[in-house]
Amino acid sequence: MKSPALQPLSMAGLQLMTPASSPMGPFFGLPWQQEAIHDNIYTPRKYQVELLEAALDHNTIVCLNTGSGKTFIAVLLTKELSYQIRGDFSRNGKRTVFLVNSANQVAQQVSAVRTHSDLKVGEYSNLEVNASWTKERWNQEFTKHQVLIMTCYVALNVLKNGYLSLSDINLLVFDECHLAILDHPYREIMKLCENCPSCPRILGLTASILNGKCDPEELEEKIQKLEKILKSNAETATDLVVLDRYTSQPCEIVVDCGPFTDRSGLYERLLMELEEALNFINDCNISVHSKERDSTLISKQILSDCRAVLVVLGPWCADKVAGMMVRELQKYIKHEQEELHRKFLLFTDTFLRKIHALCEEHFSPASLDLKFVTPKVIKLLEILRKYKPYERQQFESVEWYNNRNQDNYVSWSDSEDDDEDEEIEEKEKPETNFPSPFTNILCGIIFVERRYTAVVLNRLIKEAGKQDPELAYISSNFITGHGIGKNQPRNKQMEAEFRKQEEVLRKFRAHETNLLIATSIVEEGVDIPKCNLVVRFDLPTEYRSYVQSKGRARAPISNYIMLADTDKIKSFEEDLKTYKAIEKILRNKCSKSVDTGETDIDPVMDDDDVFPPYVLRPDDGGPRVTINTAIGHINRYCARLPSDPFTHLAPKCRTRELPDGTFYSTLYLPINSPLRASIVGPPMSCVRLAERVVALICCEKLHKIGELDDHLMPVGKETVKYEEELDLHDEEETSVPGRPGSTKRRQCYPKAIPECLRDSYPRPDQPCYLYVIGMVLTTPLPDELNFRRRKLYPPEDTTRCFGILTAKPIPQIPHFPVYTRSGEVTISIELKKSGFMLSLQMLELITRLHQYIFSHILRLEKPALEFKPTDADSAYCVLPLNVVNDSSTLDIDFKFMEDIEKSEARIGIPSTKYTKETPFVFKLEDYQDAVIIPRYRNFDQPHRFYVADVYTDLTPLSKFPSPEYETFAEYYKTKYNLDLTNLNQPLLDVDHTSSRLNLLTPRHLNQKGKALPLSSAEKRKAKWESLQNKQILVPELCAIHPIPASLWRKAVCLPSILYRLHCLLTAEELRAQTASDAGVGVRSLPADFRYPNLDFGWKKSIDSKSFISISNSSSAENDNYCKHSTIVPENAAHQGANRTSSLENHDQMSVNCRTLLSESPGKLHVEVSADLTAINGLSYNQNLANGSYDLANRDFCQGNQLNYYKQEIPVQPTTSYSIQNLYSYENQPQPSDECTLLSNKYLDGNANKSTSDGSPVMAVMPGTTDTIQVLKGRMDSEQSPSIGYSSRTLGPNPGLILQALTLSNASDGFNLERLEMLGDSFLKHAITTYLFCTYPDAHEGRLSYMRSKKVSNCNLYRLGKKKGLPSRMVVSIFDPPVNWLPPGYVVNQDKSNTDKWEKDEMTKDCMLANGKLDEDYEEEDEEEESLMWRAPKEEADYEDDFLEYDQEHIRFIDNMLMGSGAFVKKISLSPFSTTDSAYEWKMPKKSSLGSMPFSSDFEDFDYSSWDAMCYLDPSKAVEEDDFVVGFWNPSEENCGVDTGKQSISYDLHTEQCIADKSIADCVEALLGCYLTSCGERAAQLFLCSLGLKVLPVIKRTDREKALCPTRENFNSQQKNLSVSCAAASVASSRSSVLKDSEYGCLKIPPRCMFDHPDADKTLNHLISGFENFEKKINYRFKNKAYLLQAFTHASYHYNTITDCYQRLEFLGDAILDYLITKHLYEDPRQHSPGVLTDLRSALVNNTIFASLAVKYDYHKYFKAVSPELFHVIDDFVQFQLEKNEMQGMDSELRRSEEDEEKEEDIEVPKAMGDIFESLAGAIYMDSGMSLETVWQVYYPMMRPLIEKFSANVPRSPVRELLEMEPETAKFSPAERTYDGKVRVTVEVVGKGKFKGVGRSYRIAKSAAARRALRSLKANQPQVPNS
C-alpha cells in the first residue's frame, strides 16, 4: 500500500484498514500469532548478518545506530577472510589492518579480535615510539602478527614510508569512517589507495551519520562523498529505517483534528488561573543558592504539568490530574521540614483544589463529558471505535466493564494510591485469557510526550469505555519511562514502580490488554508485540522518534496515525517530508532492499497460470502449495528446525538478473536441514515471481524427502519416519492409576521362586541331594563392639550343624556373609552327597524337625501360615547334621532328632517339682552349652535364654541389686511365691536368645559400612559391670531346652541364610537366562568354578579408629553418620528401624533428627522449633514406665516444658516391639535380603535436607567388591579353582546381579543405585551412538526425541516387566516374622485375614504406639512441624545392645510408624495431624484393649507376633520418592490425596508391590552390572536381548527364524514364572549358536562431507588455522571435515560442505556423560550413589563444559553468524578471564557482588558447551569410535575439575537452598521482565525475598537461590518485603 501520507485527511474520508474491514478477513495477521510467519517474503535475517554479507561481497560503509553491531561485523569479516592472512609474511602472506581514530580505542579493538579468534594481534598506538622504528623492526612485527591495530597516524606513517604496502593488506577497516569527509589521516590513506593496483577490501564503520535534525540534501551529499572517498557502498542497518524492511509498510495517515471550541469558557478560565499561578511562582524571586533546594521547584513542575494536560486533553482531564496531584502533594507536605518549602506546597495544594472546584461547577467528575475534552481526544476515540471487533459482541453485554460504582471517581483523600486503576483493573475484568479470535483484535500503542498525559489519557479511555458500548472492548494500560532506565540507582519505591511497568508490558505481550499508552520509552529497546495501530498523539519531533514509533506498527496490516492540531499541521507537513526523504535515502542504502511498490504483481492475476501448484492427490482436492503460499511454507519449515535462542534460522534467497532482463533465484536452506543443495529456480519476468517459484520447487523437494508431511506442514520430531525405532507397543490395560513408568504407579507381582528350589520336597525312595550349610567365623567382633564382654562363639567350634535336603541340585553360588553376635560368619552351601534315598519314616521325622525349627525355635509360624510341604512352592527340608562316630564326615543326625522328639522341654515348660526331700542338684556340665527357660512365668510363650556365665560366687542368698529386695531368694518369694530347695546353687548370667532374625548386615555398621556412634567405653564398662544391668537367673527355677545353645545360635541364622540363598539363586537364574537370550556368559557354570564371595565392599578389618565416641552431638564427625541414621539392633523388633529408608527424597522432613545421635545413648534429642509452645502442658515422666527395674541414666525431664532448643527425652532401653512389622509399610514387602540402615538415596542425597549446615553426608556403601575386582580384572586369590575363568566370559557374579535387583528400600548392604547410574549413562551412550549411525540424515531434534522415547522410564519399565524382572527384585527389608515364607509353608487364605487382627500379643504392641491418624488435617501448620511424642511406657530388654546405640532412632521411627495408622487394613492417604503434642493411636476394632495392664517384668515380650501389616496401602509406600507415612509434606498441599485413594491389598509373603520407575531403575542397574562384568559389547547385546535396539540386526534366513520362536513372550508374570523360563531356555538354547552373528557392529556413517564441486578447497579455507587448535588439544584429525562440523553453528551459512554441530553434539553429550560417569564410578574412593549423582551433575553440565571450552580456546575457532550469540560469548569470555578459575555447578556464573538489586547472572552461552561436546563426538567418529581416544583428549582437560569436585562435591544452589530451608523456601512462578527475560523470586519465610533474573526459568531460579544462600550464609536476614 502506498501511504496516502502527506495530505491531511478529514475524518470523514479516513478509510482505516482495520483487520475487520480488510479484504483478507479478520483472521489475517492477528497479533497473537506473535511471531507472524511471513507469507509473501522470506523471513528476514538479522540486519547485522545482511551487513556482513554485503561486506564480504564488496567494499562497504556500515551505518549503524549504535556501536554494538560494529565490532561484530568487523571481527567476523576478519575471521572470514583470515585464510588470506595466515600465510608467512615473507612469502607474500597478507595482513589485516584496523584503523582507529585515537589511542584509547586501540585496546578495545584488540581485545575483541583476541577474544573471538586465535589470530595474532599487534597493537600500535603511540606515534612517538612507533615513528622511530626501522623497516626491520616493522618487518618483525608484521611477521609476528596477522592483525594490526593502529591509530590512523601510525598507519599513515607506516604506509607513507613504505614499511607496509597496501597490496600486503587484505582488509582495511576504518573505525568512525565519517571522519574521512574532513581533512583527516583517513583521507590521506585513501589517497594512497588510488594508485594501488590490488587495493584491499575496505570496511568503514560509522554510527554518527545521523544526529539530531538534519537536512535530507545534506545527508545525501554527506553519504555520497563518503562513498566516493572510501570507494565503498554505504549500507544502513535496518534500525535506521522501518525496522523490518520487508513487511508491508504501515499505512501512514495525518489527521487534522480541528480547533478546540469551548462554549462554557471553562478552558479559558482554567488556563488563565494556571498561568497566573505559574507567573506568581516564577516572580517569587527567592534567592536560590546553588547548595539549597529550590523551594518553588515542585510547585512549578506540578502546575506546568497541569497546564500541559489542560492544553492537550482539555478540562475534564485537567480536573483528573489535579486530583492525582493533590494526593501526591499530601506526601510531600507531610514530610517537608522547611517552612518556606512547605508554604509553596500548601499554596499549590490550595490552588489545585480551586481548579477542582471550578470544574465541578461545570460537570460532574464522575462521568465523562466529551464537551470538555480536546478535539484530539475525540478523534482518538473515533479511531478506536473503528477497531471494534465486529463479531460476537463482547460477552453479550458490557457489564463486566462497567462495574465500578464509585460516585466520585477522583477521590480527594490521600488514602488512595496514586493510580487506583491498578487495583480496579483486577476486580473489573474476569479472566480475559480466553482465546476467542476477536477479543483483542486491536493491538495498539498511543505515543504521548508527557508522563501525566499517559496516566490521564488511560483513565479517560477507561471512562469512555464505560459509557460507550462501542469502546467497551478496549482494555488499556499506560506505561511511562519512569523507572525503566537501565542504570539509575533503585530504591524500594522505584523498584515497585518498575515491577508495575513490567506487569503492564507482560499483559500487553500476552494480549490481556489491547491498548498501551506510552511515552517515548517504548520507541526503543522494549520487547513488545507487532502492533496494528500506532497513534502519535503528540507529533514526532525528530527523524529517529518518527521511525521508531512507526516501526512499532509491524503487523501485516497496520496504520500509523499522527494527530495534528490545525495550527501545527503546516509545519509538521514540512517535517514529515524531511523524514520521508531521509528514510528514502537510507532505504536505498539498505542492503538488499526490495522496494515493494514496483515489483508487486497484480494480485488478481491467477498465478497458477504462471506456474502450476504442487498438489497431493489431485483427484480428491488434496492439500496444495501454490506459487503464492510457497514462501510461507518454507519460512515455517525453517522456523521448525532445531536452533538455540539466539538463532532464528531463515532461508537465504539470492536473485540475479540475466542478460535478457529475466530473473532467476537461488534458495539456500539453513545448514541443518536435510535438504542441503541450493535450489535454483527457472527464469521469470520479475524478481518477486522468481522468488516465489523457487520456493514452490523447494516445497516439492521437501515433501518428497519426507520433511513436509502430507498436509504439507513441517514434520514435527514426533511424526518420525523412523517408526521401527519407537516400536509402538499396546499400552497394557491395567486398572492401576498413575502414569506408566512413574514412581506414582505401583503394581503387585508374585515373588520369584528359583527353579531349583521349586517342587524340591524330597520324596521317599527318590534320589535326594544333601547340602551342608557351612559356617565359619571370618571376622570376629572386635572388642570395642563387644559391649557385654560376651564370649564369642565361632560356629565352626561345634560339629553339629544344619543341612538342606532337597530333590533337585542347587547351582553353585558365591559364599556370603551373615552377621551374628560373634561377628561376620561366612556361609557356604556345599554338596555333601547326592543320589541317596530315604524311607518314609525318616522323611517324616526330618519334616517334623524342620517344622519344629521354624515354629518353635524361630517362632515364625502364625495363623496366616500353614506347614504343607507337599503344596508349598518351595519345600526343601532343613535338618541337623553331625559327624559320624568320630570321623570327620557329616551325616544326618537322626539320633539327635529322636532325642528332641522325646524331650519334655521341647515345646512347653516341664513340670518338675523339687521339694525339701528331693532338692535341686546343680550339674555344671548341663549348663555349659545350654538354652534355659524360666518356669515361673509367660507360660504361653516362655522366654529362652543362653547361659552366658555361671556365677559360682553368687547364691540365691546374695544381695539383690535393687534396694526393694534383700536377696534373690526374697525377690522370688515375694514376687512369685516360689521357695528354693537349694540355697547354695550358683546363679546364671544369661542373654536373651536372639530375636533379631535379619542377620544380613552387621548391626554395628550402618548400611555404608561406617561404624555407628557409640557411647564412651568407660560408661559402657561401668554399665555392664554393675549387676543392675545383668539378668541373673536361678538354675532351679529354669528348665533346660533340648536344643544346645551352639545349634540354637546356628538356627537363628537360618532365615537369613535361606533368604540370601534364595535371592542368589534367583540372580544366578537371571544370569543363565541372559546367557541364553543375549549370548552373554554361559548357560551353566563349569563344575569347578565358584564366583568370589558376596561382600559389601566394606573394609574387612573393622579398625578401631572407625568407632568414634561421640561426645558432642553436633561434632564434626557427626556428619559421617547419617544425619537421620537409625540403628539396626539385634532383635527382630528393630529391624524396622533401618527402614528410615522410607524417608527417601523428602525435601521436607518433619522431624529434625539431626541431633538424634546424642551424647548419652539413653536420651533422645528433639529439636523443637522455638515457637512450639503447644507442648508445655506435657510432663514427660508421666508416661515413662515405672516398673521394677532401674536404669543407669534415669534423668527424666523434671520440667513440664521443653527447653526450646535441644531437649533430651530419656528413652528407656526399648523392649523389642516388632517395629518392623509396621514397617512393611514399604509395602514392597518381600523376603528381601536386606537389612541396612538407611536408604542410600536418602542418606547421602537428602540427608541434610533438614540439617541446617548444608554439609552433605558422605556415607554410602560403595559397590560390592566384586565390582571392583571385575573392574580391576583380578580375582580373589582364595578362589583357586576359578583361575582360568572370568566373569567376562561366564557372566556377572550373581552377587552383583543381586545388587542390581536390590532397591535401596530393601536396606541391604548394597543396592542398585551406583550400578543404575552407570547403566543409565551407558544406555544413553549406546542408544545415542546407534541412532547417530543408523539415521545419518535425521537432525538433532528427531534424534533426541527418539532417544528420549527409548530411554524413558516408561519404556524401560515395559521391557523390564517383559523380562520378568519385577518378580526377581528385592524391594523391601527382609523381615522374617512379617514377610518371609519359610520353606514348606503356604499362606493360608482363610485364616490370613483374621490373623492380621486377632493376635493376642498385638494389643501390647499397639499400646506402645500412642499414635493417632487424623483423617482431616486441615492446616498446613508450619510451626508445629516438629514431631513430638511421649516416650511410651517401656520395658527394658537386657538382651540387646540398644543401650549402646541410640534408641531414639528406633523410637522415633516406631512412633512415626505407629502413629501412621499402619494397622488399618486399607489406609487411604491422610496426612498426619501434628497439632496434637503427642499422637494417640486409635486402635482399629479392639480399642478396649488399649487399657490392658503391662506386667512389669522385663522379659515378657514376644517379638514375633506382629502381623498387623499384611494389608497395606502401597500408594503410601516409599520406594523412590513417594510420601512417608506420617510425614506431611508442606510443599504438596494435596499430599498425594488424589494419587493414593487406591489401596492394593496383597500378601506380604508371596507378593511384592513395586513402583514402575523402580523396575526401570533395575533394568539400568542390570545393564551397569553386565557392563562392569562383561564389557561394552556384552552390555549392548544385553540391551538388544531386552528389546532395545542398539546394534544393527544381521538378517537371518527364514528357516533359522522358524527355529527361534520370539523370545519376547517368555516369562510373563504368572505364578509359574520359572516354568516358562525353563521353556525359554530350551527354546533359546538352539538360537544361542546364531547369537553372535545376529547383531552386527555399528558402522560409522559413510559421508561427513557433502558432494560439492570444490569441497576440499572450501574445507581448507574454512579450517585454516585449526592446526593450532589440534596442537592445543593434542589430537590430529584424520578427517578434517569432522573438525569443521564440530565448530559450525547452525547460523553459519558459509559452510556449505558439512552439517552443523548439532548431531555431533548429540553424540558427544552422551559420550562425555558416559566417560565421566564411568570415571567417577571407578574412582577408588568408591563414591556413594548420592555423591556420584552430585558429582556427575556438577561435571556434566553446560557451565562446566562452556568454561572448559573457553579455557581451551574453543571459542576462537567457533563459526557462527549470530550477533546476540557473539555478545554473549564476548561477555562470558571476559568474565572467565577476569575470574580465571573454574566455577562449580552453577549454570550461571555471577558477575559482581555489588549489584545486589537486580542481579543478572552472566549468561553461559549454551553454544560453548555444545561445541565442547560436539568436538568429543567428532573425535569419537574420527578415531573409529574409540572411547579411549576421546578420554585421552578430554581427561587432561577435565582432570583438575574432577579432582577438585571429588574432594568437595558442589551442589546446585537450588538444591542447597532447599536442603538448608526445606520448609520455608518457596519459589515464585516465572515473571517476564520488560526486556523479555525471566524473573523468579524465592521467599525464605521470615528471612526475606530474593530475586534472580535470567534468560530462562532455570537460570533465573538458580540466580535467586544463589542470592538467598549468600544472604542466609552472611546471616543478615533481609527485611522481608511486604
Swiss-Prot record:
Cofactor: Mg(2+); Mn(2+)
Keywords: ATP-binding, Cytoplasm, Disease variant, Endonuclease, Helicase, Host-virus interaction, Hydrolase, Magnesium, Manganese, Metal-binding, Nuclease, Nucleotide-binding, Phosphoprotein, Repeat, RNA-binding, RNA-mediated gene silencing
SMART domains reported for this sequence: DEXDc (SM00487), DSRM (SM00358), HELICc (SM00490), PAZ (SM00949), RIBOc (SM00535)
Helicase C-terminal domain span: 433-602
Enzyme class at the top of the EC tree: hydrolase
Consequence of substituting D1709N: In PPB; also found in non-epithelial ovarian tumor; somatic mutation; results in reduced RNase IIIb activity but retention of RNase IIIa activity
Domain PAZ: 895-1042
Domain RNase III: 1276-1403, 1666-1824
Modified residues (Phosphoserine): S413, S415, S1016, S1160, S1460, S1468, S1470, S1868
Substitution effect: P1729E: No effect on activity
Catalytic activity: Endonucleolytic cleavage to 5'-phosphomonoester
Effect of E1813K: In non-epithelial ovarian tumor; somatic mutation
Location (main, coarse): cytoplasm
Protein name according to UniProt: Endoribonuclease Dicer
Gene source species: Homo sapiens
Name of the gene: DICER1
